[in-house]
Regions:
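Glycine-rich, proline-tolerant flexible connector loops at the mouths of alpha/beta enzymes
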Residues: 1-21, 142-152
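Generic hydrophobic/aromatic pocket-lining and core-packing "Φ" positions
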Residues: 14, 37, 58, 78, ...
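Catalytic cores of alpha/beta
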Residues: 33-43, 76-84, 121-137
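Short beta-strand/loop segments at the ligand-binding rim of alpha/beta enzyme cores
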Residues: 19-28, 45-46, 61-69, 109-117
Length: 170
């Protein structure tokens, strides 16, 4: 599970999940600089996901002790990430970065790359992404929308996850 670091409580949540569910693989998302990266690692993140990249951030990630999935939104980002050795990337925001047609075009010239699109991925378009040979996963909040979380409607979240699996033959 990815804990996005967007609130002051996020790091404590990451640590609490690690403490309460030690077998769960928990990572940190929305990593944007070296200090946030260090805090995420100190709180037990087992993988790192960034929303975007800069040369400075990629340099900080080079020494990261856990797997990293850097975020990209265009061909320049993609090529910069590959210069640092990355072949598995997050496309964010996918819907504003060209979506499935963009990833199809990228596959024609860089078939060795794999993507996890997020941002604008929904139950109505997830299959379009997952049908592409260079998409290994998708991410989206439709499976755990904020209303369900606030209401502690775990059944609705479970049902949405099961439906996503069934629709995509996972």
């Amino acid at each position: 599970v990815e804990v996005v670091l967007r609130t002051p409580a996020s790091l404590a949540l990451l640590q609490a999940i690690k403490d309460e569910l030690p077998d769960m693989v928990v990572g940190a998302g929305t990593i944007t600089n070296a200090s946030i990266l260090a805090e995420a690692i100190a709180h037990g993140a087992q993988f790192i996901i960034t929303p975007t990249i800069t040369p400075t951030l990629l340099t900080a990630l080079a020494d990261c002790p856990v797997p990293v999935v850097p975020g990209v939104s265009n061909m320049s980002d993609i090529l910069l990430a590959t210069e640092f050795g990355y072949t598995e990337l997050k496309l964010f925001p996918a819907s504003l970065s060209g979506g499935a047609p963009f990833l199809k075009a990228v596959n024609a010239v860089l078939p060795q790359l794999r993507f996890c699109p997020t941002g604008g991925v929904s139950s109505s378009n997830q299959a379009d992404y997952l049908a592409l040979p260079n998409v290994i996963a998708v991410g989206g909040t439709w499976v755990a929308n904020s209303d369900w979380v606030k209401a502690k409607n775990w059944r609705a979240i479970t049902d949405a996850c099961v439906l996503a699996q069934q629709e995509n033959h996972i």
